[in-house]
C-alpha cells in the first residue's frame, strides 16, 4: 500500500528468437503498443528489445494546449505544456530492482520539430497536413524486455502511485494473471500471420492471356 511507484515482474530464459517474434506478432497488434531497440554506437542490434502497451495515461500537447487521455476520455488541462512535461518527468521515479534493466519503467512518445515553439519564438507558418499533436507521451503499464545478451525475457507490470486501488489482494491476483498471459504470448504464434504465409504459398494463375 505504498504511495511509491511499484514494479512487479517475472522472467524466463529463451533459447531462440521464435519467442521474440511471437511477441512482436501478438503484442504489437494492440492499440498504443510500441517496440524499441537499444542500439548504440552504430551497432546493427542492441542488447535490449523493449515492448510496451496498455498506457493508463496519455498526454498530448498541441498549439500550446495540454490534454490528458485516460479511461477513453480526452480532457483539456490548464497546465502549460512545458510545465506539465516537467511535472510528468519529476513524478516518474521508480526504485528499479537490481536484476532488471533501468528501462523497465519508461515514458514513451515523441517530440515533433514544432515543439521547439514552446521555448523559442518561431513563426508557425507550416501547414499541419498530418493532424498530429506536437508532443505525445504515454506511460505504459505493461512492459516486456528481451535481453539479447543474457537470453532472457522480463515481463513487467508497472503500478503508478496515483492509481486508485480499492482491493489490494484482488489487484495482486489480477497482476499475476496478466503476467501469466504475457508469458503465454511469447509461446503462441500469431494465427493471422500464419494465414498470410499460407496465402503466399497458393499457386496463382493469371486469367489474362499474354500477347
What are these regions (language model features)?
Residues 97, 101-130:
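Extended, Lys/Arg-enriched charged tracts that mediate electrostatic binding to polyanionic substrates
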Residues 50-51, 95-102, 136:
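Short, charge-rich binding segments
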Amino acid at each position: 500500500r505504498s504511495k511509491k511507484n511499484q514494479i512487479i515482474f517475472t522472467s524466463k530464459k529463451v533459447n531462440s528468437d521464435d519467442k521474440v517474434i511471437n511477441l512482436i506478432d501478438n503484442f504489437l497488434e494492440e492499440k498504443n503498443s510500441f517496440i524499441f531497440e537499444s542500439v548504440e554506437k552504430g551497432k546493427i542490434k542492441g542488447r535490449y528489445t523493449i515492448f510496451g502497451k496498455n498506457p493508463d495515461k496519455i498526454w498530448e500537447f498541441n498549439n500550446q494546449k495540454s490534454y490528458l487521455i485516460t479511461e477513453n476520455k480526452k480532457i483539456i488541462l490548464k497546465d502549460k505544456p512545458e510545465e506539465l512535461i516537467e511535472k510528468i518527468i519529476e513524478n516518474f521515479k521508480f526504485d528499479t530492482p537490481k536484476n532488471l534493466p533501468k528501462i523497465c519503467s519508461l515514458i514513451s512518445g515523441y517530440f515533433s520539430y514544432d515543439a521547439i515553439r514552446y521555448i523559442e519564438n518561431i513563426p508557425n507558418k507550416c501547414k499541419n497536413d498530418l493532424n498530429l499533436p506536437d508532443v505525445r507521451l504515454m506511460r505504459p503499464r505493461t512492459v516486456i524486455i528481451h535481453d539479447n545478451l543474457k537470453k532472457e525475457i522480463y515481463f513487467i507490470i508497472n503500478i503508478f502511485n496515483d492509481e486508485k486501488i480499492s482491493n489490494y489482494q484482488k489487484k495482486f491476483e489480477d497482476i499475476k494473471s496478466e503476467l501469466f498471459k504475457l508469458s503465454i504470448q511469447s509461446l503462441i504464434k500469431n494465427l493471422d500471420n500464419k494465414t498470410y504465409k499460407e496465402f503466399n504459398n497458393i499457386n496463382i494463375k493469371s486469367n489474362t492471356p499474354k500477347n
